[in-house]
């Protein structure tokens, strides 16, 4: 922020009465006409496109975007999303519509860590790895906010601060107990990067407590860490109705006045909810100072000024046209993002791609074959057109191939029709399979099965999954259709890891499409028939069941994610196949020995030996050879996305900085130790399971750091 806008905000707030200041701290902020301040609603959503505000381009859900491992793509998508948001805001404002979801302060991205595959909101995140989450979160923020901090196109918000990833059912009362090691090693890293590197404008506090303190009123989180350690200068907003949880569920305050005061005094500037309507009474009771109120409102006015909401500080984006909303270029990018997000989990005997010239009939079967809900996930906008996998296949093959559809079963119930018998669509599915040359079986989840507390609508626990199996009758449908004996391709639509152990053993081809966006069925069809080669990578670990996972409520990282366990892994983090082969060779570094704080650059040659152009994500992992018990193994510390034409070879280099070699100590310190480090560079995570699935080894280099143990900035 500039000195000009900061002084403007101070001058503006100095003219407000105390009551006017307090009125601006609720998400439905009223106009102050005598000061030229228009009404504004701060609650706006843009997780993977402008959401809940009518028509907009609907991109793949965040977890699918994470599977691209591509920072450049995420920034480009963020730029498109804020362009559409700004275009809509411009037109809505001209017509006097300042309602909810029609503003410029977008409460995205979600940079929580998907630490447990049962968490219902995990598909809103960028996966289980702090480094990947930080890199992609920063890229999306840069795209949303634009290049000029004094004139942002929109304001992004990193959420939910902090240590927040389920269980959904008890999020309003839950106390996440976490060690300093895990706090800094896992839960805070992406937020730090969003603040320091991407200059995110806002941070949203979480519902839960962290080590006894409610997150939206935590001195430790909001003052000591966010403001003092991270140097955050933007505004803090509460999650919706989180502040009333202080007294109603957490029982750390006695009443709403105490709750509102605790939040405001500890640095929460804006309340999504009603608690701050009680700030006047809290002030009367001596619970909150005018200084705290003034500081909060100055921060809120400052970003509104920079966004161009005051007449004498115009925005360069105020003429963006509504014609840009869901324009062809934006839709094309959404489909390209869907293509880039597809992860090929299995392709036995090169079953894929299918040869349309050799197929006369295709059976498209499953509850997600023609489901719009399975395209979009949650926090989604409205598209003017949807293309499901069934529709994508029909459009691709045209009249040359007979496409038969059967729902097969309900997503999670035992029957489709209310008055029907159990398995009332099974026989139809079997008949369709029997009459087809090949079966495309579309199974998985949607946001009614995995989602947010209060939004998910079935028997699962308030949005969280009870386990990792396909729900309802889907597993039985999978086995029944496979038993018909026709070639089967399993297309998975889900925002999280599913236990596909049976499918891995019995189904020849498996494609994970995540929630691929409004027109994602087009990308699915093109992948199946070989218009392009899927080449996404898993941003989460796929486990064989939950037997070896810790309790869901245990926030220790021991036994969780690829960084802290290698037990019962079906598909590893960073894994993904493609059509043909990508080879790596000649890994090297010129800094085999270096000082503790020196950078290390690693290089490798990458060759596309397939017949398709590819975007390959080169993954770099680092491990300290003498790691102590409780410290992680190999960790992702570098990504390079390289575009390769068929047959093309390129040399790729990645520079690792001192922080990439650091470990977090028990007391939360960040240190680089002298000694030997292993660096893996390749197209996958190092390890036995990756090697077994791909048939490839990753090249591992050893470098030595010399000198004394050094502290580095977290």
Task: Locate the predicted segments by residue.
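Glycoside hydrolase catalytic-domain context in secreted enzymes
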Residues: 1-665, 673-681, 685, 713-714
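Short proline/glycine-enriched turn/loop segments at secondary-structure junctions
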Residues: 667-670, 690
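Short beta-strand elements
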Residues: 689-713
């Amino acid at each position: 922020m500039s000195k000009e806008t900061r002084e403007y905000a101070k001058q503006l707030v100095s003219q407000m009465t105390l009551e006017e200041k307090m009125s601006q701290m609720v998400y439905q902020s009223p106009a102050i006409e005598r000061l030229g301040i228009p009404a504004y609603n701060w609650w706006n959503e843009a997780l993977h496109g402008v959401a809940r505000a009518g028509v907009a381009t609907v991109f793949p859900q965040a977890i699918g975007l994470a599977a691209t491992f591509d920072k450049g793509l995420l920034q480009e998508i963020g730029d498109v999303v804020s362009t559409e948001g700004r275009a809509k805001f411009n037109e809505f404002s001209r017509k006097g519509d300042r309602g909810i979801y029609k503003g410029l302060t977008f409460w995205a991205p979600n940079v929580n860590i998907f630490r447990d595959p049962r968490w219902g909101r995990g598909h809103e995140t960028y996966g289980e790895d702090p480094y990947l989450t930080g890199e992609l979160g920063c890229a999306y923020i840069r795209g949303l906010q634009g290049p000029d901090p004094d004139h942002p196109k929109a304001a992004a918000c990193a959420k939910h601060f902090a240590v927040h990833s389920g269980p959904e059912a008890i999020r309003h009362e839950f106390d996440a107990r976490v060690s300093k090691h895990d706090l800094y090693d896992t839960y805070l890293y992406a937020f730090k990067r969003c603040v320091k590197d991407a200059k995110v404008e806002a941070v949203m506090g979480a519902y839960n407590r962290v080590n006894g303190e409610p997150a939206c009123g935590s001195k430790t989180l909001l003052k000591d860490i966010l403001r003092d350690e991270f140097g955050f200068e933007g505004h803090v907003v509460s999650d919706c109705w989180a502040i009333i949880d202080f007294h109603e569920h957490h029982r750390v305050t006695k009443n709403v006045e105490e709750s509102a005061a605790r939040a405001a005094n500890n640095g929460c500037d804006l309340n999504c909810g009603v608690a701050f309507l009680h700030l006047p009474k809290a002030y009367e009771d001596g619970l909150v100072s005018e200084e705290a109120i003034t500081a909060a409102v100055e921060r809120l006015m400052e970003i509104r000024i920079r966004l161009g909401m005051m007449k004498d500080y115009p925005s360069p984006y105020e003429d963006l046209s509504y014609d840009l909303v869901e324009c062809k270029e934006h839709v094309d990018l959404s489909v390209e993002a869907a293509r880039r997000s597809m992860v090929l989990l299995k392709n036995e005997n090169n079953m894929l791609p299918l040869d349309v010239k050799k197929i006369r009939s295709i059976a498209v079967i499953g509850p997600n074959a023609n489901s719009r809900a399975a395209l979009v996930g949650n926090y989604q906008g409205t598209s003017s057109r949807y293309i499901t996998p069934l529709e994508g296949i029909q459009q691709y093959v045209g009249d040359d191939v007979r496409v038969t559809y059967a729902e097969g079963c309900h997503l999670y119930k035992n029957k489709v029709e209310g008055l029907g018998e159990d398995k009332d669509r099974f026989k139809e599915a079997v008949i369709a399979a029997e009459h087809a040359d090949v079966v495309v079986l579309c199974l998985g989840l949607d946001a009614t099965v995995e989602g947010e507390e209060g939004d998910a609508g079935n028997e699962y626990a308030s949005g969280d999954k009870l386990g990792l199996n396909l729900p309802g009758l889907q597993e039985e449908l999978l086995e029944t259709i496979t038993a018909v004996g026709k070639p089967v391709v399993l297309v998975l639509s889900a925002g999280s890891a599913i236990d596909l152990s049976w499918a891995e053993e019995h189904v020849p081809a498996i494609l994970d499409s995540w929630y691929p966006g409004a027109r994602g069925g087009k990308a699915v069809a093109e992948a199946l028939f070989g218009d392009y080669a899927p080449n996404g990578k898993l941003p989460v670990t796929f486990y064989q069941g939950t037997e070896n996972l810790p309790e869901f409520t245990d926030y220790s990282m021991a036994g969780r994610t690829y960084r802290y366990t290698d037990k019962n892994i079906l598909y590893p983090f960073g894994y993904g196949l493609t059509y043909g082969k990508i080879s790596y060779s000649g890994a090297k570094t010129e800094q085999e020995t270096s000082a503790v704080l020196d950078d290390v650059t690693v290089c490798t040659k990458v060759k596309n030996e397939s017949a398709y152009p590819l975007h390959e994500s080169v993954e770099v992992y680092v491990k300290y050879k003498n790691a102590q018990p409780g410290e992680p193994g190999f960790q992702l510390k570098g990504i390079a996305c390289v575009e390769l034409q068929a047959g093309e070879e390129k040399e790729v280099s990645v520079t690792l900085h001192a922080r990439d070699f650091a470990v977090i100590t028990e007391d939360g310190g960040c240190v680089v130790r002298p000694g030997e480090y292993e660096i893996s560079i390749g197209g996958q995570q190092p390890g036995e399971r990756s090697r077994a699935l791909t048939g490839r080894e990753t090249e591992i280099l050893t470098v030595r750091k010399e000198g004394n143990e050094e502290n580095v900035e977290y």
